Amino acid sequence: MKLVSFFVLLLPAAWMVSPPSHTGLCGVDVVKAYSQNILGQNVGYYINLKNNSSKTVDAVSWTANFYNNFEDLKGKKTGKWESGNFTSVAEPGESMTDLEGAWIDGATKVFIKVTRVHFTDGSSCGK
């Protein structure tokens, strides 16, 4: 009887799976991300991040999780944004944008999880 009660209590938890969403880290938040589809093929994605921290950001890395309309995971890719010769650092309150190639079959949506942030003072968080 205890075993049956245990499974009955766990059953509602199986339906409580939250839908995919964007995840920021250390004050760097995902403002928007969407996949670029051409003739039914996912060719890449656009990402817009915002530096809501009190420090200046010079690099961000993330994992892009690709889903279809049924929220089935179709694939994962890593991406990164870095300041350099043509790209300025992101001061507090500023945004960062990037466009990445992907080529994930059947993907219609992309959700971003920021995995690492590097600041100009040499500190970082994540991995």
Regions found by a protein language model. Name each.
Residues 48-54:
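Asparagine-centered strand-capping/turn motif at beta-strand->loop junctions
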Residues 61-65:
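Beta-strand signatures of extracellular beta-sandwich domains
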Residues 3-14:
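Sec-dependent N-terminal signal peptides
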Residues 15-44, 124-127:
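Transition segment at domain starts
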Residues 73-126:
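Short, solvent-exposed, Trp/other aromatic-anchored flexible loops in extracytoplasmic proteins
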Residues 42-46, 94-97:
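Intrinsic-disorder/low-complexity, polar/charged segments enriched in Ser/Thr/Lys/Arg/Asp/Glu/Gln
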Residues 55-59, 73-74:
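Short acidic/proline- and small/hydrophobic-mixed sequence motifs that coincide with surface turns
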Residues 41-43, 58-60, 108:
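Residues at beta-strand starts and edge strands
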